[in-house]
């Protein structure tokens, strides 16, 4: 089993290029299966989750090639509607393949999704919405059997919660459904707008993708297209946290400042100076961070749940007491126990975490429970005295491309070991 060893207390400085957004690339790759032609997707990150999506695409009949950060998907010969459990279990968001298969073949048979175990993440919103659009869905033994013998049709759908995954599945299904679909209380994350941009480049008619009320006029067929995935705002915030805990001076290139606006106030309250350029963000951290007021995770444009763990690691060495409230997922404090093994003083009760900043952390052997927990441990390891070994590093590989190489380029002492 591979591990990562970090020797802490090295100040990070310099420039780092941001990868493409995992949370954009995955639904776009899935949507490519509904295109009767070739999709060329640029800035597609090299991640194990992306590899899992490519395996699924190939299994259902797509020809997929990767050259650097560009993935080409030829979905002309898509023919299989059944995705085996072992492929579905490799990524949590694999349920996003449900709507492309229904739209393209009129049927789909998939297992419940895999990936990070960070709570229930129910898919009932996905299923109830697709049923409204004409899908017949049965569940048995963890397998979803879906049919739409009369095709999918437009519908007015109101989500009880602005679920990103449900919004994506509805959006893909609606883009080729008969008639108009309106999604109310839709997710507003930048990744939703990016998926809509890809679908529009394929011929879809979509408006309001960043507004919470999305209108989609279905088209009969998608054509070949080319698209560039947006930068990963979550990894941007992770680099910011890494710079902050080391008193660093880091410029993050190839980013979009408007997408990280929700996290900037937290870093500024902690004493960092943050300057946003046209396509970069510069963070200059103080010698000692300050505690911040209550941080609440919320749907976009609120503070992102995916940034919570790394920022908590940052606040664990801030002067004073900070409070975090996790409003999106239950069971998303699985990194707390491991941070405490490094010397952090964190107490949790339900959704609330109270972080009492300590002078320093001390290196130890810790284990990543999920992707974001792993990034938090990496951030903490950079701040810790001595050596920190992170086990289960394969979970970090699901979302952070070239972590060691990128951090090493900024001055970190970090190595992967077998």
Task: List PLM regions with ranges.
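Short, structured segments at the rim of ligand-binding sites
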Residues: 1-418
């Amino acid at each position: 089993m591979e591990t990562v060893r970090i020797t802490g207390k090295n100040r990070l400085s310099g420039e780092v290029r941001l990868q493409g957004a995992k949370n954009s690339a995955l639904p776009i790759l899935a949507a490519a299966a509904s295109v009767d032609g070739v999709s060329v997707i640029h800035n597609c990150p090299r991640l194990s989750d992306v590899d899992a999506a490519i395996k699924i695409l190939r299994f259902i009949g797509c020809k997929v090639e990767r050259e650097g950060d560009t993935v080409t998907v030829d979905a002309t010969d898509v023919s299989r509607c059944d995705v085996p459990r072992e492929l579905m279990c490799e990524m949590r968001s694999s349920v996003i393949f449900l709507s492309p298969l229904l739209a393209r073949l009129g049927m789909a048979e998939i297992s419940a999704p895999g990936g990070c175990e960070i709570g229930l993440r129910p898919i009932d919103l996905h299923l109830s919405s697709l049923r409204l659009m004409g899908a017949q869905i049965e569940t048995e033994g963890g397998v979803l059997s879906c049919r739409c013998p009369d095709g999918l049709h437009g519908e007015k759908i109101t989500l009880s919660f602005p679920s990103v995954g449900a919004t994506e599945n509805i959006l893909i299904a609606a883009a080729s459904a008969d008639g108009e679909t309106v999604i109310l209380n839709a997710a507003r994350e930048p990744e939703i707008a990016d998926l809509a941009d890809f679908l529009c480049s394929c011929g879809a008619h979509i408006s309001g993708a960043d507004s919470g009320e999305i209108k989609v006029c279905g088209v009969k067929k998608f054509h070949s297209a080319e698209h560039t995935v947006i930068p990963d705002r979550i990894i941007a915030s992770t680099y910011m946290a890494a710079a902050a805990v080391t008193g660093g001076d880091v410029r993050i290139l190839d980013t979009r400042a408007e997408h990280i606006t929700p996290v900037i106030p937290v870093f500024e309250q902690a004493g960092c100076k943050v300057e946003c350029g046209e396509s970069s963000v510069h963070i200059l951290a103080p010698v000692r961070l300050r505690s911040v007021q209550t941080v609440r995770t919320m749907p976009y444009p609120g503070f992102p749940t995916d940034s919570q763990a790394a920022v908590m690691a940052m606040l664990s060495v801030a002067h004073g007491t900070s409070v975090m409230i996790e409003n999106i997922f239950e069971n998303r404090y699985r990194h707390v126990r491991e941070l405490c093994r490094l010397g952090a003083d964190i107490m949790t009760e339900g959704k609330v975490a109270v972080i009492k900043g300590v002078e320093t952390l001390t290196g130890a052997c810790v284990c990543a429970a999920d992707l974001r927990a792993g990034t938090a441990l990496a951030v903490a390891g950079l701040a810790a005295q001595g050596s920190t070994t992170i086990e289960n590093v394969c979970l970090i590989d699901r979302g952070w491309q070239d972590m060691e190489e990128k951090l090493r380029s900024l001055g970190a002492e970090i190595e992967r070991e077998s």
